[in-house]
Amino acid sequence: MIFSNNKKLKFKRVIIKLSGEALQGVHKFGIDIIELNRIAKEIKAIFDLGVQIGIVIGGGNIFRGKKLAKFGINKVISDYVGMLSTIMNGLLLCDSMDLVHLSSCLMSSICIDKICEQYSFKKALSLLRRNKVVVFSGGLGNPFFTTDSAACLRAIEMRADIVLKGTKVNGVYSSDPKKSSNSILYKNISYNEVLQKELKVMDLAAFALARDHKLPICIFNINKPNALYYIVTGQKEGTLIR
């Protein structure tokens, strides 16, 4: 699809929450390079419109801390292993973006100076202003916090207009669409309605952070072609929470 670069932007600075599972493609584990490259092109399309982009990346395609904890491994240790998985994903995403001539910087909450930069609020903000894509890895650098919390905190710190959470479904539903044919897809919903209806959007700590700072969240299907383009240009896509 050929995009128009003259489209008026609804959101000029965004934080994309990209789950590890989004990078799996058709696989049950690891990374689907074809899917990774497709996502990089989707990111490039909105970058070319003039959108400033930060990406918080997950690591569930490689490792989930919760799984080891179930087998008796210390939760702190298993969470740190999960954080390392996000750095691996971040490295590959940056390389994929480089292939489409998209300049990026991988930052991490965990210090691994050979392969990524230590997260710095001022440096990250400066990079965004200079039109570099910033990939935030390592979660928050502390156990017991999810990458959803990292996405919301980084969005607040970077003064982003919105968090775009890419999932495998088209948005927020009234019930599980796989279990109920009567499930309704919400196009717009408030923070309070999400809490009252006990809808699964993200973990409560992350969601409360977004609500308290009046940070809009859009839940959308990352596997749907052109979804990012539609969102930043103000077209109806996914579920907008505000």
UniProtKB/Swiss-Prot annotation:
Source species of the chain: Buchnera aphidicola subsp. Baizongia pistaciae (strain Bp)
Binding-site positions, ATP: 17-20, 60, 64, 167, 173, 176
Gene that this sequence comes from: pyrH
Pathway of action: Pyrimidine metabolism; CTP biosynthesis via de novo pathway; UDP from UMP (UMPK route): step 1/1
Subcellular location: Cytoplasm
UniProt name for this protein: Uridylate kinase
One GO MF term: UMP kinase activity
Binding locations of UMP: 59, 79, 140-147
HAMAP family the UniProt entry points to: PyrH_B
